Amino acid sequence: MKMRPEEISSIIMKQIEQYNQEVQVVNFGTVFQVGDGIARIYGLEKVMAGELLEFEDGTIGIALNLEAKNVGAVLMGDGLKIKEGSKVRATGKVAQIAVGEGYLGRVVDSLARPIDGKGDIASDDTRLIESPAPGIISRRSVHEPLQTGLIAVDAMIPIGRGQRELIIGDRQTGKTAIAIDTILNQKGKNVICVYVAIGQKASSVAQVVNTLRERGALDYTVIVTANADSAATLQYLAPYTGATIAEYFMYTNRHTLVIYDDLSKQAQAYREMSLLLRRPPGREAYPGDVFYLHSRLLERAAKLNDALGSGSMTALPIVETQEGDVSAYIPTNVISITDGQIFLSADIFNSGVRPAINVGISVSRVGSAAQPKAMKQVAGSLKLQLAQFEELRAFSQFASDLDQATQNQLARGARLVEILKQAQNSPLGLAEQVASIYAGNNGYFDNLQVLQVRPFLIGLRQLLATKYSKYGEIVASAQTLTPEAETILKQAITEYLDEFGAKK
């Protein structure tokens, strides 16, 4: 084959024209210390706080400490192959994850990578893990209810869409159970749920996944998990990943519910990272910015205004206390950030009242504006009645003879407590809750034994669902207890009282 000189010259000219003299600057550093999930690097002169770093073995780290002579980075992995002298490259990016509709029904890790063995997830978009919270003008006040399906919560500590309500209590008092019941109750209500498990046993997370799958709730739920054996960095990032996934749905005009289970473990992971990075310790050895750790996460929960599509993100953070001490550092921090708290007591739990909510110190600061009118009609005085009952019960232990009015009040209170008892994974609709409280408030249980109240309520709900289904339809559509609905309810209660008496 003979080459012509003009052909060669034209190829050379074309190459010269297409040549782009672009200098690509890559910022490299060298590891001089590594261990305990922390690496110290020198030579990385142009690096941002929070920037992702790539190590020789493919491990990703986050630059957290920018010091005069070196950079302190936390590793998203075990980093066992990183050695002293290894090269590190600054990527110029901050942590971001893929988001999209494909995440529904999936279990992912702190970097939104699937870990359920169902293959890759198709994503529509990416979002920064650390996004700014919506501003004041972007929000509107909480005004729509988010029903948990638990009578005690929906009646006395109501939650609205866009609210942040803390669930706080000792270990094994039913905190996760309340959160899971709330997810189950969102079925058919167009609410997308994100459950974030931080520092939990893999078996506990598997149990939650199975419960949601069996009850058809996994279809509208995303589970983000950083198990107890995960690196502290991944446990620290997991809640932000959950919030980012929920934000995607919130900004596409949907309602979302995020559960952080639990933030005590995230704070402990952050404390571990900070101490290893030699940041100065503060109260309980937590770093000085641990309040900011939680405030910037929980402030992302919001009810957006109409111009932004009216989406919402409701947050239910969980915090574990030691011996019921709510005055410890992390509990007081999160209480001050949130819009109320549901306090669970070990003593109440052990006495057989479940959910074990201590009504006296539980509060919802903004939820009453979102409570359905039907619930307000029947539950207005419920909290006061229960508080008076608790006071009288404590006093009656020392008094030998009580007058008839006090005895009646104690009897009514004991029956109201029975109404609030509820089995796990069995949330109730608004109409069923209203019927239960209405019957208790109006003395229909006064002639029943305390232990007969719950069997009676189960039978009454079945009767209302079958023979008197119009009652449920009216309450569901009008959201109020109309005179017609009240008449039907009275008729059903009276009829079932006779039937229940005959059964005895």
UniProtKB/Swiss-Prot annotation:
Major localisation: plastid
Family matches, as PROSITE patterns: ATPASE_ALPHA_BETA
Keywords for the protein's UniProt record, in alphabetical order: ATP synthesis, ATP-binding, CF(1), Chloroplast, Hydrogen ion transport, Ion transport, Membrane, Nucleotide-binding, Plastid, Thylakoid, Translocase, Transport
InterPro entries, alphabetized: ATP_synth_asu-like_sf, ATP_synth_asu_C, ATP_synth_asu_C_sf, ATP_synth_F1_a_nt-bd_dom, ATP_synth_F1_asu, ATPase_a/bsu_AS, ATPase_F1/V1/A1_a/bsu_N, ATPase_F1/V1/A1_a/bsu_N_sf
GO MF term set: ADP binding; ATP binding; proton-transporting ATP synthase activity, rotational mechanism
GO cellular component term, pick one: chloroplast thylakoid membrane
Leading EC class: translocase
SUPFAM superfamilies according to UniProt: C-terminal domain of alpha and beta subunits of F1 ATP synthase, N-terminal domain of alpha and beta subunits of F1 ATP synthase, P-loop containing nucleoside triphosphate hydrolases
Thylakoid keyword on record: yes
Sequence positions that bind ATP: 169-176
Localization in the cell: Plastid, Chloroplast thylakoid membrane
Catalysed reactions, semicolon-separated: ATP + H2O + 4 H(+)(in) = ADP + phosphate + 5 H(+)(out)
A Pfam family it matches: ATP-synt_ab_N
Site description Required for activity, residues in chain: 362
Presence of the UniProt keyword Translocase in the record: yes
Protein topology in the membrane: Peripheral membrane protein
Enzyme Commission number(s): 7.1.2.2
Task of the protein: Produces ATP from ADP in the presence of a proton gradient across the membrane. The alpha chain is a regulatory subunit.
Subunit and partners: F-type ATPases have 2 components, CF(1) - the catalytic core - and CF(0) - the membrane proton channel. CF(1) has five subunits: alpha(3), beta(3), gamma(1), delta(1), epsilon(1). CF(0) has four main subunits: a, b, b' and c.
Similarity-based family: Belongs to the ATPase alpha/beta chains family.
This protein's name: ATP synthase subunit alpha, chloroplastic
Originating gene: atpA
